[in-house]
Swiss-Prot record:
Protein name: Probable tRNA sulfurtransferase
TM regions (residue ranges): none
Function: Catalyzes the ATP-dependent transfer of a sulfur to tRNA to produce 4-thiouridine in position 8 of tRNAs, which functions as a near-UV photosensor. Also catalyzes the transfer of sulfur to the sulfur carrier protein ThiS, forming ThiS-thiocarboxylate. This is a step in the synthesis of thiazole, in the thiamine biosynthesis pathway. The sulfur is donated as persulfide by IscS.
Recorded catalytic activity of this chain's protein: [ThiI sulfur-carrier protein]-S-sulfanyl-L-cysteine + a uridine in tRNA + 2 reduced [2Fe-2S]-[ferredoxin] + ATP + H(+) = [ThiI sulfur-carrier protein]-L-cysteine + a 4-thiouridine in tRNA + 2 oxidized [2Fe-2S]-[ferredoxin] + AMP + diphosphate; [ThiS sulfur-carrier protein]-C-terminal Gly-Gly-AMP + S-sulfanyl-L-cysteinyl-[cysteine desulfurase] + AH2 = [ThiS sulfur-carrier protein]-C-terminal-Gly-aminoethanethioate + L-cysteinyl-[cysteine desulfurase] + A + AMP + 2 H(+)
Protein encoded by which gene: thiI
Species of origin: Bacillus subtilis (strain 168)
């Protein structure tokens, strides 16, 4: 059967009222970006659907890309025919015969966007179902759990028939909800937090704190690899590498040992906030999960948050470690996160960090130290790079020759 289109169904975009048009346009841009290596494709979108005309491109090659685009509820290979009853019946029968084997069940589900069509939805289901039953053997109807779900979408300009649905990533198109900075370490949590933030439509830029010689170049490469993993869901990932050695050394010298972790997090948050402001972001994302470690108690979060009024988003706040690790496997960051290269937070962890720090105490300790020059020096010497998934990176390298 010659499937010549892909039909894309939107998720939450359909509920966005007056903003629907901008959401759909953003989704179209994101789809074009991940499918940019397929120049023959043509795109058409309406209120709650998008259609891609293949023009000879291999549809199976497109599926892995489409599954990673947030904002897509599901998508299907589709056959296009004229919106005439006889044409629809003939196309439906041909599609079923191409798929079924004796003993299979099927269901017809019609969506009639073209209200002037001669039959209503129920009449159409009965007409097409009866036509298929009369012209096949060993095929029966099952409206609850069919082996072959035949969907028919009747529009004025054409009708589309689909048989197999592929599940999309759901959520909202990346970039439709604004920009935020992700505090990206080398562990399991922050990449998963970044994934969930992108799923809610945020354009994410990553911030990593690097403290050589205490942390190695391999630890830095690990974070770059994690950013590449996340870039699959947004087309690319901007990563800001913050030189943090001098600041951490000062903290170790000037702040009481059991409060060094709290001070470190507060300084990190202030630097991330400066980057956010320069990059026109509106929030900061962390991988914190309530009570998971000493710095993630409610008292710690309160003391750390006090340095900024910027919204701090914590997508993992109610998840446990097992759930987070399972999600990291699902999104492809697990194998990188498990590599044994420590980041600056683990290198300088005190033996007995304060689990319930007092905001007044850490402010008192910090009042004896002028951190501002160190913050500004770190911001002035940030290394910024744009990273792509391995396939996109290979394509860009090939373009140089």
């Amino acid at each position: 059967m010659n499937y010549d289109h892909i039909l894309i169904r939107f998720g939450e975009i359909s509920t966005k009222g007056k903003n629907r048009k901008s959401f759909i346009e953003r989704l179209k841009q994101n789809i074009r970006l991940v499918l940019k290596d397929y120049p023959n494709l043509k795109y058409f979108s309406n209120r709650d659907r998008m259609t891609i005309t293949l023009n000879g491109e291999d549809p199976e090659a497109l599926f892995p890309h489409l599954k990673q685009v947030f904002g897509i509820q599901s998508f299907s290979l589709a056959i296009k025919c004229d919106s005439r009853l006889d044409d629809i019946k003939a196309t439906a029968l041909k599609a079923i015969k191409d798929q079924y084997k004796p003993g299979d069940t099927f269901k017809v589900a019609t969506k009639r966007a073209y209200k002037q069509f001669e039959l209503d939805t129920n009449q159409m289901n009965a007409e097409i179902g009866g036509h298929i039953l009369r012209n096949t053997e060993g095929l029966t109807v099952d409206v609850r759990n069919p082996d072959i779900p035949l969907r028919i979408e009747i529009r004025e300009e054409a009708t589309f028939l689909t048989i197999r649905d592929e599940k999309g990533a759901g959520g909202l198109p990346v970039g439709s909800a604004g920009k935020a900075m992700l505090m990206l370490s080398g562990g399991f949590d922050s990449p998963v937090a970044g994934f969930y933030a992108m799923k809610r439509g945020l354009s994410v830029e990553a911030v990593h704190f690097f403290s050589p010689p205490y942390t190695s170049e391999r630890a830095k490469q690990k974070v770059m690899d994690l950013a590449k993993c996340l870039s699959r869901f947004g087309g690319s990932m901007t990563l800001h590498i913050v030189p943090f050695t001098k600041t951490q050394e000062l903290i170790q010298k000037q702040i009481p040992e059991n409060y060094t972790m709290t001070a470190t997090r507060r300084l990190m948050l202030q630097i991330a906030d400066r980057i956010r402001e320069k990059r026109n972001g509106l929030a900061i994302i962390t991988g914190e999960s309530l009570g998971q470690v000493a710095s993630q108690t409610l008292e710690s979060m309160y003391a750390i948050n006090a340095v900024t009024s910027t919204p701090i988003l914590r997508p993992l706040i109610a998840m446990d470690k097992t759930e987070i690790i399972e999600k990291s496997r699902e999104i492809g960051t697990y194998e990188t996160s498990i590599q044994p290269f420590e980041d600056c937070c683990t290198i300088f962890t005190p033996p007995s960090p304060k689990t319930r720090p007092k905001k007044e105490k850490i402010e008192h300790f910090e009042s004896f130290v002028d951190f501002e020059p160190y913050i500004q020096e770190a911001v002035d010497n940030i290394e910024t790079m744009t990273l792509y998934s391995e396939q996109e990176a290979n394509d860009k390298f090939a373009e140089l020759f």
